[in-house]
């Protein structure tokens, strides 16, 4: 009897997590920002290593008004939510490049990535940008020390390659290949772009590379000014009193 064909997202997760980790992979479906309130439940989570479960979950929840995501780190067994305190294994460095936020064209960005001394292990086209991954030869336990070191490197990587700084954290959700980006009425498939053989890196090699770079290889566009004012007085007051507004998770998710 022929085994059912796996969803592309399940195949991707097997390649990324299969040989270097042991604990559950976190996958979820989230309502798009513009679709909030149209369904009673926003987040539909799944934490498992069963590829069949992931395939069926992806087929069920890949639909307009929602997005399918996976966490870049594994979670502890039994976890029902994704947060730094529920992470188990750190498996990669990653970057979220939004084409509208960088000065390079999509093809220029791809060429720059390919020319890096340590090119990405794999790259996904998110529909409006690139999600790139530098896989570790061996996963790291998600201790506070390892989290701090990996997030330091994620910050260097984002600065060097024009990535979103908000995505430079170890519990990040990124779009699942084989699903569709349906924001603002679009229906664009998230696809894995071939980078050749899957390369895994020692953390020391990535550290030496990122600590040696200077000027950005992919520059970000300067932020646009809103109404002609140089600053937002409300944000200035918030900064003065060290007030932090609640994080809008969907707004921060990758394009």
Placement of each model-derived feature along the sequence:
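Short, structured patches in soluble enzyme cores that scaffold and shape functional sites
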Residues: 134-138, 177-178, 192
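N-terminal structured subdomain of primase-like DNA metabolism proteins
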Residues: 221-255
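Long, charge-rich alpha-helical interaction segments
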Residues: 24, 188-235
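Short, polar loop/linker segments at the starts of domains and inter-domain junctions
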Residues: 37-50, 107, 185-200, 248-253
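Short, hydrophobic/amphipathic alpha-helical patches that form generic packing surfaces
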Residues: 75, 178, 254-255
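Signature for HUH/AEP ssDNA processing cores
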Residues: 1-130, 136-152, 159-160, 218-221, ...
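Charge-rich, solvent-exposed alpha-helical interaction surfaces
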Residues: 12, 153-156, 209, 237, ...
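Flexible helix-coil linker/hinge segments at domain or subdomain boundaries
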Residues: 155-187, 206-220
């Amino acid at each position: 009897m022929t085994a059912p064909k796996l969803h592309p997202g399940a195949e991707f997760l097997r390649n990324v997590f299969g040989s270097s980790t042991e604990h559950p992979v976190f996958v979820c479906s989230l309502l798009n920002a513009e679709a909030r309130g149209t369904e009673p439940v926003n987040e539909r989570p799944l934490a498992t290593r069963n590829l069949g479960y992931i395939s069926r979950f992806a087929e069920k929840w890949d639909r307009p008004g929602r997005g399918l995501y996976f966490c870049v780190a594994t979670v502890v067994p039994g976890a029902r939510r994704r947060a730094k305190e529920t992470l188990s294994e750190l498996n990669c460095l990653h970057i979220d490049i939004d084409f509208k936020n960088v000065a390079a064209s999509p093809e220029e960005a791809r060429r720059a990535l390919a020319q890096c001394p340590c090119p990405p292990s794999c790259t996904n086209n998110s529909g409006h940008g690139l999600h790139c991954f530098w896989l570790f030869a061996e996963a790291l336990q998600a201790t506070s020390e390892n989290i701090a070191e990996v997030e330091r490197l994620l910050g260097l990587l984002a600065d060097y390659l024009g990535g979103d700084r908000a995505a430079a954290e170890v519990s990040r959700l990124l779009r699942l290949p084989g699903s569709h980006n349906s924001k603002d009425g679009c229906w664009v498939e998230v696809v894995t772009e071939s980078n050749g053989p899957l390369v895994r890196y020692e953390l020391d090699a990535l550290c030496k590379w990122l600590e040696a770079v200077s000027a950005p290889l992919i520059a970000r566009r300067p932020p646009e000014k809103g109404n002609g004012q140089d600053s937002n007085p409300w944000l200035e007051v918030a900064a003065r009193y060290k007030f932090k507004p609640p994080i809008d998770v969907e707004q921060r998710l990758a394009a």
